[in-house]
């Protein structure tokens, strides 16, 4: 996906999120049990402001976090600020990020597009409305991001965050497959490795890219995808994803 496409997806999902959450401010968010719709709107507003300030300052903003009187107003204002920072910069410009291999504005552009589509799903779940399909290119990019940058990188850089779950892994492999793209996820006891392509595996997660992305982010149940093979390793992947994406 190119920069223009990320911005296009970011805007579409922001507009959908804001419209849906406006009618669900007091509703619980099933995928984020401690939150209401208002909490969701405030969280996304805070994320947008944090990333805009990180790019503007060249450092993590401090003091943090802010407080908002009206989450919907803050959401709109901070979305405009975030997009303003993106359009003022090239994707290849330097920016501090939490992902060591990519210290660029482009990292945040991709991350905010993916952040927004997941929280758009949360808003739809809170409102009890059918979710808008996730475009295939955005969903496949999101699968790659969450497997490589959240799961694999997270398990390597912050293994302590995975507690006893990581040492229990024994090297078995799960294939994540959308038909057009596939990833091999090896659950090792010291790190999780992710590669594109095919190899031998003990289990698989198969489905449309939209469904697979939602399953990996725990925004869909098992019946949204086809699970095949060793149930233990599938459950282990599910548990590891819950930690990686919390």
Residue ranges of model-derived segments:
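C-terminal interaction segments
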Residues: 197-246
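A glycine-rich beta-turn/hairpin centered on an aromatic-Pro dipeptide
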Residues: 146-184
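Amphipathic alpha-helix face/heptad-repeat signature
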Residues: 6-13, 71-78, 108, 112-115, ...
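Short, contiguous alpha-helical
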Residues: 15, 23-62, 100-157, 212
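Hydrophobic/aromatic-rich structural module bridging two neighboring secondary-structure elements via a short loop
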Residues: 57-112
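Acidic/His-leaning functional-site neighborhoods
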Residues: 173-210
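Non-cleavable N-terminal signal-anchor transmembrane helices
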Residues: 1-27
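Short, mixed-charge aromatic SLiMs
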Residues: 65-77, 137-151, 231-244
């Amino acid at each position: 996906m190119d920069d223009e496409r990320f911005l296009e997806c970011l805007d579409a999902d922001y507009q959908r999120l804001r419209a849906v959450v406006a009618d669900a401010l007091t509703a619980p968010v099933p995928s984020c049990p401690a939150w209401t719709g208002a909490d969701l709107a405030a969280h996304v507003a805070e994320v947008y402001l944090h990333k805009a300030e990180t790019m503007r300052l060249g450092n993590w903003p401090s003091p943090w976090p802010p407080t908002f009187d009206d989450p919907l107003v803050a959401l709109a204002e901070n979305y405009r600020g975030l997009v303003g920072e993106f359009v003022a910069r090239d994707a290849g410009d330097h920016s501090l990020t939490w992902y060591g291999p990519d210290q660029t504005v482009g990292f945040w552009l991709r991350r905010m597009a993916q952040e927004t589509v997941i929280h758009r799903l949360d808003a739809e779940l809170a409102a009890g409305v059918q979710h808008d399909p996730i475009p295939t290119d955005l969903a496949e990019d999101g699968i790659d991001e969450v497997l490589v940058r959240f799961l694999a990188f997270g398990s390597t850089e912050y293994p302590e965050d995975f507690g006893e779950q990581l040492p229990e892994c024994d090297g078995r492999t799960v294939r994540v497959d959308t038909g057009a793209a596939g990833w091999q996820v090896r659950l090792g006891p010291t790190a999780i490795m992710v590669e594109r392509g095919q190899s031998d595996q003990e289990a698989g997660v198969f489905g449309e890219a939209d469904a697979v992305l939602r399953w990996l982010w725990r925004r869909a149940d098992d019946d949204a995808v086809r699970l095949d093979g060793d149930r233990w390793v599938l459950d282990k992947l599910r548990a590891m994803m819950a930690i990686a994406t919390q």
